[in-house]
UniProtKB/Swiss-Prot annotation:
PANTHER family: LARGE RIBOSOMAL SUBUNIT PROTEIN BL19M, RIBOSOMAL PROTEIN L19. The keyword Disulfide bond does not apply. This is Large ribosomal subunit protein bL19. One of its GO terms (cellular component) is cytosolic large ribosomal subunit. Keywords: Ribonucleoprotein, Ribosomal protein. GO terms for biological process: translation. Pfam families: Ribosomal_L19. It comes from Prochlorococcus marinus (strain SARG / CCMP1375 / SS120). GO terms for molecular function: structural constituent of ribosome. It comes from the Bacteria. Gene3D superfamilies: 2.30.30.790. Residues 1-15, 28-39 have a biased composition (Basic and acidic residues). Residues 1-44 are annotated as: Disordered. This protein is located at the 30S-50S ribosomal subunit interface and may play a role in the structure and function of the aminoacyl-tRNA binding site.
Length: 160
């Protein structure tokens, strides 16, 4: 009976061969896989879109918040000339994120409220400069549309 047990258990040499063969198998599979390179890596559609959007975003966009008074430089082309026209007002809304991020800027021009929606990463937006920080407790300031005169002012924030 002891001889049967001895015959069924592998000898030291056989066990070393088994260990070496089991070690060799994963290495062989690792070597056959292609190296990770940008040209050969296959991305999912969602990852590909995210990568494209990231490449199209502007690098230096200031951190703006709802309630801030900003000056947006808008590129205007007249004929073959191009100039930058400033548009200053209060941000009353921010929407979306990433490449499609928009801000709605409101100002009073000749007694009439004018709102413009700017895509932050658009080539038509030359610059965004924060003139003063606003202290508000709402994500959207649509209530400013109903206010007139001094009631449309936003308190200034000094900590940002």
């Amino acid at each position: 009976m002891t001889e049967d047990l001895k015959n069924t258990s592998p000898s030291k040499e056989e066990s070393n061969e088994i260990e070496e063969s089991s070690k060799a198998t994963p290495k062989a599979t690792r070597e056959t896989k292609p190296k990770d390179s940008p040209s050969k890596t296959k991305l999912s559609a969602q990852a590909l879109i995210a990568q494209f959007e990231k490449s199209q975003q502007k690098k230096k966009v200031p951190e703006v918040y709802v309630g801030d008074t900003v000056r947006v430089g808008v590129r205007i082309s007249e004929g073959n000339k191009e100039r930058v026209q400033p548009y200053e007002g209060v941000i009353i809304a921010k929407r979306h994120g990433g490449l499609n991020q928009t801000i709605t800027v409101r100002r009073i021009f000749q007694g009439v409220g004018v709102e413009r929606v700017f895509m932050v990463h658009s080539p038509q937006v030359a610059s965004i400069k924060v003139e003063r920080r606003g202290k508000v407790r709402r994500a959207k300031l649509f209530y400013l549309r109903d206010r007139v005169g001094k009631a449309t002012r936003v308190k200034q924030r000094f900590d940002r």
